[in-house]
């Protein structure tokens, strides 16, 4: 008997703001996991405010300012949860404050910005980065492909 492929996104909201877009984010991130051929994989998405993400940025990256998204990938690629065969990728922290301000700054919806940040964080968990022009081209290309194929356009 074939075992069922289960990918999970676990949400945790550390802010007072209700995040109406959780279901959409779960769908787009599950779509991204499927696109990357991941099986039995999970990770956490944690919504925070600018103060919280500022502290994370300062304490773990020595950068004394807020940012939009920070990821903490588990170093062991074969990390398992509770003895199961489920692989835990790590945590994605998203600043809702920053997502709102960037959506306004870039002239698109909060839904689009939050989706972009979630997918961006997902690719960081997979080891992608954008420190060089070439890395950025690859990572941002993958992100945009997921968002476009899923149906999240820039003007959403």
Give residue spans per PLM region:
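An acidic/histidine-cluster motif and surrounding catalytic segment
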Residues: 1-112, 123-156
């Amino acid at each position: 008997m074939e075992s069922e492929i289960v990918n999970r996104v676990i949400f945790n909201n550390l802010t007072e703001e209700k995040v109406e877009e959780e279901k959409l984010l779960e769908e787009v991130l599950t779509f991204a996991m499927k696109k990357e051929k991941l099986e039995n994989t999970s990770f956490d998405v944690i919504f925070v405010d600018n103060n919280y993400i500022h502290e994370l940025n300062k304490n773990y990256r020595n950068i004394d300012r807020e940012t939009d998204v920070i990821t903490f990938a588990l170093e062991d690629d074969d990390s398992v949860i509770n003895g199961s065969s489920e692989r835990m990728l790590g945590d994605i922290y998203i600043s809702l404050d920053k997502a709102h301000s960037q959506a306004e700054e870039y002239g698109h919806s909060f839904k689009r910005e939050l989706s972009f940040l979630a997918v961006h964080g997902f690719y960081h968990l997979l080891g992608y980065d954008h420190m060089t022009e070439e890395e950025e081209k690859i990572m941002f290309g993958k992100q945009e492909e997921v968002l476009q194929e899923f149906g999240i356009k820039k003007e959403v």
